């Protein structure tokens, strides 16, 4: 699906820019000169949320209350309505969205809002075999204060498929990206891991990529068939805090995680 795969970048005061996938992995960290780091603090705050195409009331107040202090907001099913684009460009230096499929007015897909300009951007898409709808993922890279580069992977996994072949196939290009990156990584989103085979495929992938799972003590994540759908995985960072915000503003609850980019846990 490379032909129709691209990201749209929204920056305040500038026209939206279409970004195509890079030609090679060599461009990771070399595509653009590193600008301001993602965070000048000793912590990185992220919000991860399937926003349900902003179909419910209060989604904007949740973003305003909990997203504006985050360095990264990873949204799934984000529809580029004027309200969302305005919030994104008013509060973040960059907002990158991969349109999974185009609705009559506004494209919907994963969208990453960031407090720094990415130095690398790679959009990915995979088509669901049954409904023929596409799900998207986005790989972006940001400079950290300690000169390391943080790779961020925003994922909305395919939902309707027989077996796990297509599910695993969507993870393959993500794995290629992570394997070519030596620095810290955050991979998060709606993984639609509602069956044991899907859960096993996801955990196997995380192990192969040396990613740890963020644990939530009061685990109020959205579930299907008793299994959580939303996850945050990481490497090369420490987890300071992790919580789930209970809200009716979407059919998923947002995940809030604070990392410190100091020496990783052994």
From Swiss-Prot:
GO terms for cellular component: cytoplasm. Disulfide bonds: none annotated. The gene is yafD. The lineage of its organism: Bacteria, Pseudomonadati, Pseudomonadota, Gammaproteobacteria, Enterobacterales. HAMAP family: UPF0294. GO terms for molecular function: catalytic activity. It is found in: Cytoplasm. It comes from Salmonella typhimurium (strain LT2 / SGSC1412 / ATCC 700720). This is UPF0294 protein YafD. It comes from the Bacteria. Its main location: cytoplasm. Coiled coil: none annotated.
